[in-house]
Amino acid sequence: MKCKASRIIKTTYSRVALLAILSLSLSANARPTTKHVLAFYSTGVERDHVIFAEQAVKFFAAVARTHGFEFSSTTDWNDLDATRLHGVQLILWLNESPHTPSQRAAFENYMERGGGWMGFHAAGYNDESTGWPWFVNFLGGTVFYGNNWPPLPALLDVDDRSSSVTRRVPSHFMSPANEWYMWKPSPRPNPEVKVLITLARSNYPIGLKDTIEGGDVPVVWSNTRYRMIYMNMGHGDKIFNSAEQNRLFEDALESLLNQSR
């Protein structure tokens, strides 16, 4: 009887221990993985682009604290490699883009495998000298064509109010002083591109030294083949002076983090 009782006790202890281990394992698996956003920028570029990037780092660090994701930044573009990008859900390019073949290849691989990207202003700059056809297609087949000068505020029209990116901005809002880029061809005709915000035609002509006289000038769009958003804003120290535009930046980041592809 004593042996039988002992076996029963041992069996009970084993079952309890197994249940405890399973419970701990399930609890660990149930914990949500903290998402990580990594911002790239350069300090050796145009001063107004550096100012924007430094302000953006502070802005998105504050957004991270509010929304509970990890945020880090780097000025070393060699961090654009598979090892460093492992576990990163979203990349930000604040004022430039990669230049070396290895950096570009790492970014292409990251995006083709479902990575996320949000680029600002000069991060989308490309022309015939850039020599990166993949990136032109990534932006929707569009190439930088010109800009206004000096930086000026502009009225923006929201093309899609149903998007999670634009849900907290009005149909029309004033954006702080910025250097606005023109694109040729416009990315809009591309069936894979979703234009979210456009420079309002009531702004034309905009500029003094260099002028945008008219035309279709998208300023925020996504290539739906990827988890990405391009924003033309990003020149100077006034970009974060608009609460409406700040909500746009915050919601765009959240939207990209929550998308799956």
Where are these regions (language model features)?
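Bacterial N-terminal signal peptides that target proteins for export
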Residues: 2-17
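Bacterial N-terminal signal peptides
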Residues: 15-25
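Helical hinge/lid and interdomain linker segments adjacent to catalytic or ligand-binding clefts
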Residues: 31, 38-127
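Extracellular ligand-binding/catalytic regions of CAZymes and related secreted enzymes
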Residues: 31-41, 51, 59-62, 66-69, ...
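Extracytoplasmic/secreted proteins, especially bacterial periplasmic and envelope-associated proteins
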Residues: 55, 59, 102, 106, ...
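A glycine-rich, often tryptophan-bearing local segment used as a flexible ligand/cofactor-contacting loop or short
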Residues: 97-169
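Catalytic beta-strand/loop cores that center a nucleophilic Ser/Cys/Thr
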Residues: 145-225
